Amino acid sequence: LKNKIINEKYEITREEAIFLSQIPNNDMETLNILFDAADQIREAFCGKYFDLCTIINAKSGKCSENCKYCAQSAHFKTGADVYGLVSKELALCEAKRNENEGAHRFSLVTSGRGLNGNEKELDKLVEIYKYIGEHTGKLELCASHGICTKEALQKLADAGVLTYHHNLESSRRFYPNVCTSHTYDDRINTIKNAKAVGLDVCSGGIFGLGETIEDRIDMALDLRALEICSVPINVLTPIPGTPFENNVPVEPLEILKTISIYRFIMPETYLRYGGGRIKLGEHVKTGLRCGINSALTGN
């Protein structure tokens, strides 16, 4: 499979991905062969470049949505910080600090369902992105503001945003177990809207929501079909007060196995270490030879 992917740009099937997933988590000899193959695919398609991005929580708490993993949902009592949109001066200060520390990309992330019907917030965000763009160097701007129309996304693009972030979070099958206040198709449509106005899209998910490895594979196949350029891989950090606070953690070696399979499925994509990677413990460095070639930095 590795050779077919490298030499023929072969797209592996769901059945082939599931076959790889059946390697036992305690079979280190075979897992190491899988990890090395994923690393060779990464090297062939992506080279040695490692991309760094960073985000700030630009508006926090009181989210109307009921995503069961999220501290910022108004449906759960988590003690999360609550504040409105940050000032352009504070956003610029954070952008410059992160640029000086080596980040290639910088994003504002805001709580809430999205920007649809919220022209006041959209206009403020446009002002902030323009301000950051005017006062930084080569820092690329990304945005993460939930469900959006083409019109709102076009305004963000015109303000200098290059990439829009909107996770699928899990598979279509499992998504109703994660959130019921919006649908999987709402997320798909936002991704399509972003691509329609010329934005690159960053979209991935969270491991440990209660999904199966087949769900993770199905999400990856959807991401491939959507031609996503950056896939953040997050590991659930259970938040007290949320419905998922007692979720059983995914074994670190299963996470690494899944990352390797993602590299087989998406050979040219940035596979990005996101939140919760500390859950991998001593195995976190191994991810760098399983296909990871980018990371979200910061606290």
Predicted segments, located by residue:
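Active-site phosphate/pyrophosphate- and oxyanion-stabilizing loops and adjacent acidic/basic residues
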Residues: 39-40, 130, 260, 285
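Auxiliary Fe-S-binding modules of radical SAM enzymes
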Residues: 1-29, 224-299
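Core AdoMet radical
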Residues: 58, 75-93, 98-191, 200-204, ...
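Catalytic cores of alpha/beta
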Residues: 148-158, 209-222, 278-290
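Conserved, mostly hydrophobic/aromatic
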Residues: 38, 67, 166, 194, ...
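Short functional micro-motifs and their immediate structural scaffolds
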Residues: 68, 72-75
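Conserved strand-turn element in the central/C-terminal portion of the radical SAM core barrel
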Residues: 106, 113-116, 190-214, 233-248, ...
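Flexible, acidic/Gly-rich N-terminal and inter-domain linker regions that tether
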Residues: 1-65
